[in-house]
Amino acid sequence: MSAVKPLEAVARDRVGKGAARAVRRQGRVPAVIYGGGQSPQSISLDANQTHHLIYGGGFLTTVFEIEVGGRKIRAIPRDYQLDPVKDLPLHVDFLRVTAGQTVAVEVPVHFVNQDAAPGLKQKSGMLNVVHHTVALEVSPDAIPDAIDVDLTGKDIGDTIHVSDLALPAGASLALDPSETVATLVPPTVLPAAAEEAAVSEAAPAETTKEG
């Protein structure tokens, strides 16, 4: 489960494109906190810190405790915009989170213990991944960093379905339980056949001289 992270912010009185450009010139990123039955709160964040948070991974699945004007607001990033040329953050949208609320998040799927899967280790099969991420409806306090799929004992022909995924308590998936997450498939070319073909191509043809 992702830990709640502290984040310092400064309240913004002015909004609009001109005000946003002025904020960026000061080395900060304009942002807004909305939802929770309250009026939107315009804030600004440190640009360097925001850049590191976005590119550090898991930004959109992390709950932040934002301190602004002596108040602490729990919120989760819903979206952010990047400069199309410099890839620097231009704006961040946060959603307030409250007790009993659930949020929709995209969580990565990690496939673990691949060396313990006979279909991959001994038979040189391939893991054909259909879903690298899955959409969860989950409590903000229970958002996982990732959903791990254990491949121990998996062989060629085995399929991992959505119903096989281990979810946090109270979480639900938007996908059909019977939908495929990944399958173990045979190698494109069998290792032995590929090796024999390589040897055949490398060996010079024998010729017999008649004397």
UniProtKB/Swiss-Prot annotation:
GO biological processes: translation
Keyword vocabulary terms for this entry: Ribonucleoprotein, Ribosomal protein, RNA-binding, rRNA-binding
Single Gene Ontology MF annotation: 5S rRNA binding
InterPro entries: Rbsml_bL25/Gln-tRNA_synth_N, Ribosomal_bL25/Gln-tRNA_synth, Ribosomal_bL25_b-dom, Ribosomal_bL25_C, Ribosomal_bL25_long, Ribosomal_L25_dom, Ribosomal_uL5_bac-type
GO cellular component: cytosolic large ribosomal subunit
Pfam families according to UniProt: Ribosomal_L25p, Ribosomal_TL5_C
CDD domains associated with the record: Ribosomal_L25_TL5_CTC
Disulfide bonds: none
Function: This is one of the proteins that binds to the 5S RNA in the ribosome where it forms part of the central protuberance.
Quaternary structure annotation from Swiss-Prot or TrEMBL: Part of the 50S ribosomal subunit; part of the 5S rRNA/L5/L18/L25 subcomplex. Contacts the 5S rRNA. Binds to the 5S rRNA independently of L5 and L18.
PANTHER family named among the record's database cross-references: RIBOSOMAL PROTEIN L25/GLN-TRNA SYNTHETASE, ANTI-CODON-BINDING DOMAIN-CONTAINING PROTEIN, RIBOSOMAL PROTEIN L25_GLN-TRNA SYNTHETASE, ANTI-CODON-BINDING DOMAIN-CONTAINING PROTEIN
Family assignment from sequence similarity: Belongs to the bacterial ribosomal protein bL25 family. CTC subfamily.
Protein name (Swiss-Prot/TrEMBL): Large ribosomal subunit protein bL25
Organism: Methylobacterium nodulans (strain LMG 21967 / CNCM I-2342 / ORS 2060)
Protein's gene: rplY
